[in-house]
Regions:
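Active-site catalytic motif of lipid deacylating hydrolases and related acyltransferases
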Residues: 1-32, 69-85, 167-171, 191
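Active-site nucleophile elbow and catalytic-triad environment of alpha/beta-hydrolase enzymes
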Residues: 110-128
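Conserved alpha/beta-hydrolase "acid-adjacent" motif
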Residues: 144-150
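Residue in the alpha/beta-hydrolase core beta-strand immediately N-terminal to the catalytic nucleophile
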Residues: 33, 37, 62-64
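Short beta-strand/loop motif that positions the catalytic acidic residue
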Residues: 137-139, 143
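Flexible "cap/lid" loop of the alpha/beta hydrolase fold
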Residues: 49-88
Length: 194
């Protein structure tokens, strides 16, 4: 998808995701999970709200929301920062390490990060949804972007079970604790039986 145009807004992004999920769910034999990290968690909630309203296919077994506090929390305006400021921000938050700092990789990533950030920054829920679906909230205890009081708001976004799963590193714990993150997601069926 790297050669495709950037999404203009959250509506466009979520409509694309919705269409892809619909195609996959129609062919799937098993229940599915819907999730995302940071901006992706907000997008997952927006897509799930759309699935519920349209009733074209079943709701996910659960939503996996990682690296996101309150859905209506104030967002840092990353899209208006200079390239060096974006790089500094991502290094500080733990999102860049190793090979990702190579110049060619940065030239590829910075425009994507800026465009995605703009979509996220310009979006807000008119009213945060409360959905009839289980949720797994994955977070880092060391992430300044997800204060405890905001994490507790996820209890208001579901009429069903909300499971909190802590990690240790930083906002990008899915990169730094990759194996544990993957193992955790694989084991969610133990908690959510649909």
């Amino acid at each position: 998808r790297i050669m495709e145009d950037f999404f203009a807004n959250m509506e466009e992004l979520c409509e694309d995701v919705y269409g892809r999920i619909k195609n996959d769910v129609e062919r799937a034999e098993n229940p599915y999970y819907l999730g995302g990290h940071c901006m992706g968690a907000a997008a997952a909630m927006y897509v799930a709200e759309r699935i519920l309203k349209r009733e074209e296919f079943p709701m996910p077994r659960a939503i996996i929301a990682s690296g996101h506090g309150s859905l209506n929390a104030e967002k840092e305006r990353l899209s208006t920062k200079s390239d060096p400021e974006i790089i500094e921000f991502l290094i500080r938050e733990g999102g860049f390490f190793g090979d990702s700092l190579e110049e060619e990789m940065l030239e590829l990533m910075i425009p994507i990060i800026r465009a995605d950030s703009k979509v996220y920054e310009d979006f807000s829920f008119k009213k945060a949804p409360c959905l009839p679906v289980d949720m797994a909230v994955l977070y880092s205890e060391n992430d300044r972007k997800t204060p405890r009081e905001e994490l507790e708001e996820w209890l208001t976004y579901s009429t069903r079970q909300v499971l909190y799963i802590p990690f240790q590193s930083n906002h990008y714990f899915l990169l730094h604790e990759r194996d544990r993150y993957i193992d955790t997601v694989k084991k969610l069926d133990q908690y959510f039986t649909g």
